[in-house]
């Protein structure tokens, strides 16, 4: 199993479809041998049941040829480890999965499939990758990169306001929520205040004891 990991919105899903899917098609793989499901889509909600997901894939894999199984947001499937272990026993299935949130941390999933899975780490854009799509000189590009980072979607926004709104949304509704869920934090307002304090002193040493007090 190939396990695609990385922070949210860094391009994990895009790596598999269209990039990897188009690579397979360009190299002669029959489209019927590519089984893809976006498990966070309402139209695929029934396949968040592990038994139904298993049955769906096996109904598609009708011969002994290799089938490429691409499962996006696998954490939506209850007890997804069990269905992935079942796929591992099928020699004609080449499985690729992505996942997000606290249920799918890299260390957890790699431990579960140690020796039976390969981790593919996806990162935000490097500066050179950012500059390959940035419309401007390197000095301005560096300032943009330092200020807004390398999440791929940032490169599609024109105004500073759009970029700031996008990043604030990711921080408040995605990243912080993952921390809250992972650590079972009940007072999320205190966490947000703590993050603001730490963010205001970037580049300075932070003393956990002082923060606690």
Briefly describe each language-model feature range.
Residues 35-66:
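Short glycine-rich substrate-engagement loop in P-loop NTPases that contacts/grips substrate
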Residues 12-13:
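Conserved lysine of the Walker
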Residues 70, 94-100, 121, 130:
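Structural recognition of the conserved hydrophobic beta-strand(s) that form the central parallel beta-sheet
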Residues 123, 128-213:
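Interdomain hinge/linker elements that couple catalytic modules in large macromolecular machines
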Residues 81-97, 102, 110-111:
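Conserved catalytic/switch belt of AAA+ P-loop NTPases
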Residues 61-80:
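Conserved P-loop NTPase "ATPase switch" module shared by AAA+ and STAND
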Residues 86, 103-119, 133-135:
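Short regulatory helix/loop adjacent to the ATP-binding pocket of P-loop NTPases
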Residues 4:
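Hydrophobic anchor at the beta1->P-loop junction of P-loop NTPases
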């Amino acid at each position: 199993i190939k396990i695609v990991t990385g922070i949210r919105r860094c391009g994990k899903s895009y790596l598999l479809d269209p990039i990897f899917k188009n690579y397979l098609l360009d190299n002669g793989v029959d489209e019927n041998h590519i089984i893809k499901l976006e498990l966070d889509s309402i139209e695929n909600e029934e396949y968040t049941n592990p038994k139904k997901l298993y049955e769906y894939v096996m109904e598609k894999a009708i011969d002994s040829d290799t089938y490429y199984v691409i499962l996006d947001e696998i954490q939506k499937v209850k007890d997804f480890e069990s269905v992935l272990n079942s796929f591992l026993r099928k020699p004609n299935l080449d499985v690729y999965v992505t996942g997000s949130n606290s249920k799918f941390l890299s260390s957890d999933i790699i431990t579960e499939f140690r020796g039976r899975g390969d981790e593919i780490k996806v990162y935000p854009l490097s500066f050179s990758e950012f500059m390959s799509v940035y419309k401007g000189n390197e000095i301005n590009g560096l300032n943009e990169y330092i200020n807004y980072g390398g999440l791929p979607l940032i490169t599609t926004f024109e105004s500073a306001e759009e970029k700031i709104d996008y990043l604030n949304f990711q921080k408040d509704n995605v990243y912080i929520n993952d921390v809250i869920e992972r650590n079972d934090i009940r007072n999320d307002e205190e966490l947000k205040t703590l993050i603001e304090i730490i963010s205001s002193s970037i580049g300075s040493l932070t003393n956990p004891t002082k923060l606690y007090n």
